[in-house]
Amino acid sequence: MKAIAIVGSPRKEGNTEIITHHALKAIAEEGIETEMVRLAGLDIRHCTACGVCRQEEKCPIKDDVFGIFTKMKEADAVILATPVYYGSATSLIKALMDRTGHLSGQRRVFAGKVGGPLVVARRAGQNFTHAQLEFWFHLLGFYMPGSTYWNISFGREKGDVEKDEEGMRTAWNFGKNTAFLVKKLKA
């Protein structure tokens, strides 16, 4: 069993990675292999709405997205983690989400997998961003575990998120619930 977390922050080792590591640690404690993938520094291009994916069931854009998709398809659980930039998910995570068009719909590549969002905000936009990611998980057929609250944490400067006790606890519980659901589905 494996869980992969995809971090859409352009800042390495910032608050989004801190909260993601925290959730992954909770998952790993339950005996599930974990991996974190940083989108920062990868070649992630935006969807051009060319329509090729509807005809040929593949995307003609050649970049690092396909390696990430392979990891996502092989995983039992997928987490998307993003900071809030101007009231929304980062363009990195949004580009990845948009590029799954050829994997959605009738293909249902991710149906039956476990998934959910982790969101970090300085002040506002976290609920919209959380919902934005949740809708994507629903669209692709993921099962989403709950937590003690929305999977939202607060922090601006690097490390601030660790001061958000409720956010850290929520991420931990999300990790535990993710592991529980993966195990139940694999039983």
What are these regions (language model features)?
Residues 32-42:
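A short beta-strand-loop structural module common to alpha/beta enzyme folds
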Residues 1, 29, 67, 138-187:
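Glycine-rich phosphate/pyrophosphate-binding loop and the adjoining helix
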Residues 33-35, 58, 143:
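Conserved beta-strand segments of alpha/beta enzyme cores
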Residues 1-32:
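N-terminal beta1-alpha1 ligand-phosphate binding loop
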Residues 42-72:
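Cysteine-cluster motifs in flexible loop/terminal segments that predominantly coordinate metals
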Residues 60-143, 149:
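Helix-loop-strand module that forms the ligand-binding subsite of alpha/beta enzymes
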Residues 17-21, 130, 168:
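Short amphipathic alpha-helical segment that frequently serves as the phosphate-/nucleotide-binding helix
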